Every structure is written in C-alpha cells, then in structure tokens.
Amino acid sequence: MTTMIRDVRDRREERLRGGGVIAGALVLVGGVFAVAGRLGFNPTDDGYILAQSYRILHGEVPHLDFISPRPVGSPIIHLLDFALPLPLMIASRLVTTAELVATAVLIGWLVIGRSPARWRAWEGVAVAASALISIHGFPLMDWHTIDGVLLVALGFVLVQYPRTTVTGFLALGAALVVKQSFFLAPLLGVAMVAARTAPAARLATTLRSLLWAAVPGALYVLVISAFGAFPSFVREITGARPIYGRDLMNEMLTHGDLARSAVVVVLLVALVAADSRPRSWIGTVLRGALTAVVVGTALQQHLQLYGTWGDQLEEIVGIVVLWHMYRRRRVDWPGIAVVGTGWMVSLSWGYAVPNLVAGGLVLLAVIRIWDGHQVATRPSALVSVLVAVAVFGATAAVFVHTRRTDIYRDRPASQLTFPLSRIAPDFGSIRTNPDTGAYLSDMKACIRQMPASKVALLPNNAALYPVLHLHDPLPLDWLWIDEIGGSHAQILDAARSLDRQGDYLVLFETQDASVVPMVGLQPGSAPLASDILGVLHGRQTRCGPFVAVYSPPGAAH
C-alpha cells in the first residue's frame, strides 16, 4: 500500500514537472520573440525558405520548376507558416523561435539522460540558458540548419528508447531531406542502438535501423521522380559546392584558444587527482572553475552572430567528453552525438560554425563535469538552483543586449523606425531602418507602375514574392552564387523563355540589398543578373534604385 501511494505521488510530481517544463518553454519562446521577433529585416536570405514554400503551395515541383541545391524538406515543413492565423513573417519567426527552444529541450533530454518530467529545478533553468546561447544573434528566420538540428535532436532522443527507435530513425533520415550535411546523424543513431544490442542481434539491428533511416529520403526521391524531376535533382545536388568541415577545423586550429584548452586539460587532470581523495572540497572548486571557463567561453563575445566563440566551445567540450569517457570507462554516445551535431551544423557555405548548438555544448560540458559529484554543503539543491539562476540571468542580459544592438544585416533597435506593414500586411509588426524601408517602398511603387503577371526581383528580395503575392518566372528566388551551383544555363534559358512570352517585369538592383541598412545606397554586382539583363528585350527604364525591364501584357517577342 505504501509503495502504491509513493508511485501515485511520484507520477503526480512528474506530471507537474513536465507541465512546468512545457510552461517554461512557452514562456521562453514568448520572451525571445518579444525581445527579437519584430526587430529588423534584410531583403536577402530572410524569407528564402518561405519563397520556396510559396512555390510548392502554387503547384511547382521541386528541382523541376525551381532550383534547389539541397532537398526541399525545409520548404515543405514551413508550409505550416502559411497555415497559421498570423501575418506570414510573424508566423515564420514565431515558428523558428519555437523550433530553437524545442531543440534546446531535446538536447537537454539527451545530455541529462532523463525526460524533462524528471528534471531537477536547476537542470530546467540550465536548459533555458542553453537555449539562449544557441539562439545567440542568429536571425529568427526559417532556415535549413534550424530544421535539421531539431530533427537530429528529436531522433537522438527517440532512439534511446526501444519503443520509439523506429520513429527516431525516421526523424534522423528526415534530417537529410532537409540538408544533406546531416548525413552523419543516422550513423550515430545506429551506433547508439548497436551499443545496447546483444552481439548476436547487432548486425540485423544495424541493417534494420539504416533501412528505417532511408525511408524519408527514398520517399522524397520517389515523389520527385514521379514528376520527372529526378535528373534535375541529381544535377542540382551534385553541382553544389561541397563542404568537408575544413572551415571548422581550420577555425579551431587558427582561432581556437589553445591557452584556454590547456587550462581545461590541466583542471581536468587535477580533478582526477582531487577525486581520488574522499570528501575533498578541492573537487568542488575545480569543477566550479571548469564551469566558469565553459560558460565564460560561450559569453566572451556576447553571443554575437559572427565570432570564434562557438569554435572554441566545440574544442573544449570535445576535451571534456573525452575526459568523461576516460573517467567512466565507457563510450559517451550522447556526448559524441552532441559534439558531432556541432560539426554537422558547421557544414555550411555561409555560417561554418557550431553556434546553433553552442548552448547544448555548454550544457553537455557542465553535466559531464559535475557527473557523480556531491556538493559538500547541506542545502546543495538550493545552491545549484541559485547558481543556475545566476547563470541564466547573466546569459539573458547578454542575449537581450546583443539582440537589440547587433541585429542581422540591420541597425540597432533604436534606429528601426520604419514599420514594414506599410509594405505589406504579411510583415505584421516588424520594423526596419528607414533606408531599407525606402528601398522596399520604391520596389513596391515600381511594381504598381508597371503591372505584369510575372515579376522577378534580382538578385535578392526572396521574401517579397510570398509577402506581395508575386509569381517569380525564374527558377531561383535568391541568386546567390552557391545556390546557383551548376544551374546557370537553366536560369538563362528560363529568362529567354520569359522574354518570348512577354507580360513581365524584372527589377535589377543598382544597390546591394545586403548593405542597404549599413552604408546607405551602394552599387552592387551580380554576374548572373547581368547575364539575365542581356537576354531580355523589354523596355528598359530607371525606376527608383532599380533598372526595370518591362514587357507589358500582350507584348510577346
């Protein structure tokens, strides 16, 4: 009877804790969005995923009607953004914020080794701090890496449990449909499952796991093949510039703080000696010092978007994981998975750093440093909570300051005085600087003055297609060199076809949209845009900061 009462009480406590974690996560999503969700906009890559989702909504076939150097899992996921009863750009940023917080919770689940319903108070606060670190100064926009990390974290958690292993491998396989750089995730998942499987069944389990992980990719290929897009899919994927992780390794070797890593190694070696003594307070002090080094590394550059802090974290957390495996005499698969995810995140053309999982790296290091250690104070639980709250407070202060002063390709919050609702209702309450506002106002005026059923805005401005409900006649919404890959000829063929059909407006930037908010009006260069201009024979005119090529309805060439 006593055992039954205790079980009922424990289940009730777990439900309360689980509800507390959910409530805390929702509050954190709301807080992050309130701080950063409506600040800044730049008409380059912000909205690029939404533009591809918009194409799918209008019946276009990926890799056939539009170009993508990666599978289009992210545009499919973010069809959700269009279904929410909110202005599109607000919905997009809210979904992204929720994804980032959910990823932090899942990585916390993996690293702590217990479900959120069984977390102690200080662990929940630490996970909240890790979420802010991982979000750092990254723009709150739909992006492949954010979707991929969420699926990878979900998969790693689910493969820990026999009942959800299949679902876990489906999630890990789906990450490859989002971005092929997550190829290592299913292999790590297989290693996790194989490690807990009896030797006699290991081969069969491995093959079965790989087959489940292959299901999302196989379905993707089957569907696009049914529409005749397989040859172009292969061309676009293989034509993309490969990434081997060299950037991260180079950054760790050239910008990694060797002195900091050396300090970590010395402290860890000293910790081995200190722990050999019974009830040694030195172990607590050394662990506190190591924790300060790890957290200090994360905050040293104020969570800025660009910086070497994430590379340094990857380096020292890798050292901590190796030390922990040596101490425990067993392979730390969750630790390897998180460090490996940091490497996969760094496989990027434009953002080759592990910062989007930096908070998970910090949490991993802290949990492993304190693993098995009992603090020699009576109210140790209270001390742990107070320390965690202090770290969260410091992290939140740095986060808020950075998000208001170092806004992605825009100006500080005090200078964001232009409400983008003037451009389109789907911008909601987002604000930008007056120069970007004037740039977008001129663009909208040009579109109004020269009506056409097909409008292209080159080489940037991807968000404007779904926001202004425009049909882009070219197969790529953002003419960035790495997105183009080997599809130069295909884009020019589409431009020639557009010219023959007529009824189009193509606006060419005479200023680079990426630098408008920072230095005012500047000439930009885009070689492919110049080539497109050369094959269009519509009427050329100057319209605000754009060169317009216009072929009115009924004026086919």
List PLM regions with ranges.
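Multi-pass, polyprenyl lipid-linked donor-dependent membrane glycosyltransferases
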Residues: 95-99, 122, 134-154, 178, ...
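Membrane-interface transmembrane helices that cradle and orient dolichyl/undecaprenyl
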Residues: 152-167, 273-276, 320-331
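Membrane-interface alpha helices of multi-pass inner-membrane proteins
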Residues: 153-156, 165-192, 215, 337-348
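Aromatic/acidic, Gly/Pro-rich catalytic loop(s) in extracytoplasmic/lumenal soluble domains
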Residues: 502-557
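Short periplasmic/luminal acceptor-recognition loop of GT-C membrane glycosyltransferases, typified by
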Residues: 400-482, 502-516, 545-546, 550
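Extracytoplasmic catalytic/substrate-binding loops of multi-pass membrane glycan-assembly enzymes
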Residues: 37-52, 65-80, 87, 227-230, ...
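Perimembrane helix-loop-helix junctions
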Residues: 185-217, 244-245, 271-281, 364-376
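Transmembrane-helix motifs of polytopic, lipid-linked glycan transferases
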Residues: 94-117
